[in-house]
């Protein structure tokens, strides 16, 4: 996962503190006050985005090896099942069983690749886990299964993603004006 681009957390916090100190002065001209208030809002937004990216990065780095080994295990199992499905001498019952296993492995792979980025990773193949861990794993696996069945992908950005979901504005033919121009 690439590092977050832009100023670091400490730089942003320092700029925010500087702006807040400046805004505490009572004899500040109105135009400068407005300018610094706007800058403060922008810096606070940047800080929250940087903190979110920092948290994503930290979680990604912590579970990188576990996810790598689980992904390899799932890919290896899929490859084995594909090879066995190519065998034409297999009877129908075994073929259905292989197809069912293949579907499960594909959902496992989707679980590993598209796990929610801001939550601690719950291993698929771990043994001897608590009830809460089992419940979390089953809940996320069921969500991935639903997405797999419907063909939807990337509802949640993958943990390797460096982007935060952005709400898109619905653009119709005449609504191309910007908020800035309306003021």
Swiss-Prot record:
- KW Transferase (keyword) present: no
Q: Is Ion transport included in the keywords of this UniProt record?
A: no
Q: Which residues form a coiled coil?
A: 33-94
Q: What is the lineage of its organism?
A: Eukaryota, Fungi, Dikarya, Ascomycota, Taphrinomycotina
Q: Where is the composition biased (Polar residues)?
A: 158-173
Name the protein family.
Belongs to the EFG1 family.
Q: Where in the cell is it found?
A: Nucleus, Nucleolus
**Domain of life (superkingdom):** Eukaryota
Keywords, sorted A to Z: Coiled coil, Nucleus, rRNA processing
Q: Please give the name of this protein.
A: rRNA-processing protein efg1
| Chain spans, region Disordered | 148-183
**Species for this entry:** Schizosaccharomyces pombe (strain 972 / ATCC 24843)
Query: What biological-process terms (Gene Ontology) are attached?
Result: maturation of SSU-rRNA from tricistronic rRNA transcript (SSU-rRNA, 5.8S rRNA, LSU-rRNA)
């Amino acid at each position: 996962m690439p590092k977050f681009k832009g100023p670091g957390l400490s730089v942003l916090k320092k700029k925010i503190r500087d702006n807040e100190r400046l805004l505490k002065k009572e004899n500040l001209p109105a135009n400068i006050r407005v300018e610094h208030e706007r800058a403060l809002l922008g810096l606070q937004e940047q800080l929250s985005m940087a903190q979110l990216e920092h948290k994503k990065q930290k979680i990604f780095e912590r579970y990188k090896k576990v996810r790598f080994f689980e992904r390899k295990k799932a890919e290896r199992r899929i490859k084995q099942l594909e090879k066995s499905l190519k065998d034409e001498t297999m009877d129908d019952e075994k073929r259905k069983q292989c197809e069912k296993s293949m579907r499960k492995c594909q959902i496992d792979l989707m679980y590993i690749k598209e796990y929610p980025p801001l939550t601690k990773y719950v291993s698929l193949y771990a043994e001897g886990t608590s009830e809460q861990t089992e419940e979390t794993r089953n809940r996320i696996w069921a969500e991935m299964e639903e997405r797999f069945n419907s063909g939807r992908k990337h509802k949640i950005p993958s943990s390797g993603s460096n982007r935060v979901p952005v709400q898109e504005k619905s653009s119709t033919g005449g609504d191309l004006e910007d908020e800035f121009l309306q003021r």
